Regions:
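C-terminal His-loop and adjacent cap/lid subdomain of alpha/beta-hydrolase
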Residues: 1-289
């Protein structure tokens, strides 16, 4: 089985031991699930660059994901169904809507809301699958290896586009504080920044000496490979683009295997393998919202 170890870090009463109708109380299980997958399996062949990922002594590609599972304390009262909620940027999505729960709060247990899923007896699970989510406690992600060739790590060009609503001096080279691809060389003369008046307007190249890889911190410009800084400031409405070289190619498609294989493990894995749902799932439902 692709799940090689379920590392449980905590078990606690869910929602302070709240009882959900005839099903009763739930338990919350948190931890890390470790995978080892065969890169040559037909079931995995559509994952881009999986054969370029490093392998262990058994020829498997390893990676790991954060997970959380909610199960009835008395699983005989459950409905023998699993609801696997696909995280959106590491945050709960579908289950929140199903339960009419409060807005996601990092590092806080999922709000039970009206308890719909629990009152129906569902086991509910989440598994990190995006490698670039912010490293914030409570946001679930996945740790994947970088692809590499016989010549070593993979380098290539990255294009980052951004547009602002307010004047800004520096910008992280990613969206919504996700992990960025850092520039290889802060002084790379071949790095390019362009600006457009709007999306369909012609691009104008901004002279290299007018911008840099840096961030503004307490009114001081600090060199930083993960930020772009423009001396004159980024203007609202205009479209900016940075093209630069980076090294490191995470095999991000492994996140899709994490969802597939964690869901399968919860349905078919045994008690001896550490499965908190062992023997209590007949049907699985997978849903996500973006």
């Amino acid at each position: 089985m692709p799940v090689i170890n379920l590392e449980i870090k905590s078990r606690m009463p869910y929602a302070g031991g709240q009882s959900f109708g005839e099903v009763g109380a739930y338990e919350q299980v948190d931890g890390m699930v470790h995978f080892g997958v065969d890169p040559d399996s037909l079931a995995n062949e559509t994952i881009s660059d999986i054969r370029l990922a490093p392998k262990d002594g058994q020829g498997k590609v390893g990676f790991s994901s954060d997970f959380r599972v909610l199960v009835p304390v008395d699983q005989s009262k459950g409905n023998r169904r699993l609801f696997l909620d696909i995280l959106n940027r590491g945050k709960y999505s579908a289950a929140k809507d199903m339960n009419s729960s409060a807005t996601f709060v990092p590092d806080a247990p999922p709000d039970p809301g009206n308890g719909f899923l629990m009152r129906q007896g569902y086991s509910v699970a989440w598994c990190g699958w995006q490698h670039d989510v912010p490293e914030i406690s409570g946001i679930m992600g996945i740790r994947v290896p970088d692809a590499a060739t016989t010549q070593g790590p993979i380098s290539g060009k990255v294009v980052v586009t951004f547009q602002f609503n307010t004047p800004t001096a520096s910008q992280l080279l990613s969206d919504r504080n996700h992990r960025s691809y850092p520039a290889d060389d802060l002084d790379d003369p071949n790095a390019i920044m362009t600006v457009q008046e709007h999306e369909d307007a012609p691009e104008e190249i901004i002279p290299r000496d007018q911008w840099s890889f840096a961030r503004v911190e307490e009114e001081t410009v600090v060199p930083d490979s993960q930020y772009a800084y423009l001396a004159s400031g980024f203007q609202p409405g205009k479209v900016y683009q940075v093209i630069y070289t980076t090294t490191g190619a995470p095999v991000s498609g492994l996140g899709l295997l994490a969802i597939r294989d964690f869901g399968s493990f919860l349905r078919y894995g045994s008690t001896d393998e550490g499965n908190p749902c062992a023997g209590n799932i007949d049907h699985s439902y997978v849903s996500g919202v973006s």
